[in-house]
Amino acid sequence: MAKRDYYEILGVQKGADDKEIKRAYKRLAMKYHPDRTKGDKESEEKFKEINEAYEVLADKEKRAMYDQYGHAAFEQGGGAGGFGGFSGADFGDIFGDMFGDIFGGGRSRQRVVRGEDLRYDIEISLEEAVKGCKKDIQINTLVHCGTCHGSGAEAGSKIESCPTCHGAGRVRRQQSFFVTEQTCPHCHGTGKKIEKPCHTCHGEGRVHKTQNLTVTIPMGVDTGNQLRLAGKGAAGENGAPAGDLYVVIHVKKHHIFERDGNNLYCEVPISFTMAALGGEVEIPTLDGRLKVKIPAETQTGKLLRLRGKGITSRGYAGDLICEIVIETPIKLNEEQKELLRKLEESLEGKTLQRPKSSGFLDGVKKFFDNLGK
C-alpha cells in the first residue's frame, strides 16, 4: 500500500511555513492522542502517521530531501541508505505545550537525546561509481569521553539528581490552561549534579575526536545517492546513542562518457569516407575496447546502441549509446582538393546520392515560391 503524502496527512500546502506545520500538527495530535482515544486502533494508526509526517516536515534538511525524492528518500537499501531514526523534531516541547498535566501529568523522565546525524560529501570517478569501491574518509565528531565513559564525572565522584528538575532534565511551568516544558536551566538537560566534573571532558561526557572510517560504495551509485552509516554520527548526551553518518555521493564529470540513469552516451568521430563506404571503428566501453561496424551511407547524428554496455545497478544493465560525428578533413593539399571537386561534380544533380541536400533545397524552393504568391 502506497504511503500518503506528508503534507496531505497534516492538511497543509507544500509551501506551508514552519508555524503552519507546527499548528496543524498540534491540532491533529490533540485530536488523535492515545490518552484521548483510549484504545481506538484507527486513531492510534493516525497518530503514528501524523508523528511520522511531522518528523520529516519539521526538519529543514529532511523536508528538502522529501520535496525532492518523496518517500524514497527515507527508504533503506540499494545505493542510498534511508533515514532511520530521526532526531530533528522536538516532540517534548510540543506535547508539553499541548498536554502538560492534563493527562496524568507531573511525571517526567530524563530524556535520552540521540546524537546528531552528520553529513560527509565524497567525490568519486565514474569508473568507481560503476564498479563500486572502498574509500577512506576522515571526520571530526563528538565521541563519548574515554576517561569518564560518557558520565561526565571523575572516578569516585558523586553524581546526584539535579535538585531543580529532580533528574528529569526538563522543568514545567503552568501557563493558564497549559503547561510548558523546557530544558532545566541548572543542569542544562543532563538531570545530574556532578560533584567533581571529569578533567578530560569538563563534565560534558563527550569530546571532539578525528575518526578514520572506510566507506564501502556499492556499484551503480550516482550523484545525490546517500549511504547511511548507522551509529557513526555524533555521540549523544548523557551516554545516549550516537547519530548516523550520511555519505553523499558526487560523481566527477567524465572526459568521454555522459550518464543518464543507467545509460551512457558518447560521441564517435569517423571520417567522411568511412561514413560513405562503411568500415570498422574502435569504441571505448567500461569493459575495454570494442570494435563496431559502421554501415555504408551513415549520416552524422546516427545513434548506435550497444545493449548491456552501460551501467549495472540493482540487477539492471543500461546501454551505451554512441552518436556518430562525421569529421570534415582540414589542411588539404591541392591534389586532395581537386579530387574532392571532381567528386562533387560527379554528384551534381543526383538527388538519390545526396538525400539530405536535395530535401533541403526542395524545401528552400517551396519557401521562396510561397513568399512570391
From Swiss-Prot:
Superkingdom: Bacteria
Cofactor: Zn(2+)
Domain remarks: The J domain is necessary and sufficient to stimulate DnaK ATPase activity. Zinc center 1 plays an important role in the autonomous, DnaK-independent chaperone activity of DnaJ. Zinc center 2 is essential for interaction with DnaK and for DnaJ activity.
Placement of CXXCXGXG motif repeats on the sequence: 145-152, 162-169, 184-191, 198-205
Cellular component, GO annotation: cytoplasm
Gene: dnaJ
Keyword Metal-binding: yes
Pfam family, one: DnaJ_CXXCXGXG
Subunit-structure text: Homodimer.
PANTHER family the UniProt entry points to: CHAPERONE PROTEIN DNAJ, DNAJ HOMOLOG 1, MITOCHONDRIAL-RELATED
Binding site for Zn(2+) 2: 162, 165, 184, 187
Protein name as catalogued: Chaperone protein DnaJ
Residues that bind Zn(2+) 1: 145, 148, 198, 201
Record note on cofactor: Binds 2 Zn(2+) ions per monomer.
Keyword Cell inner membrane: no
GO molecular function: ATP binding; heat shock protein binding; unfolded protein binding; zinc ion binding
Protein species of origin: Histophilus somni (strain 129Pt) (Haemophilus somnus)
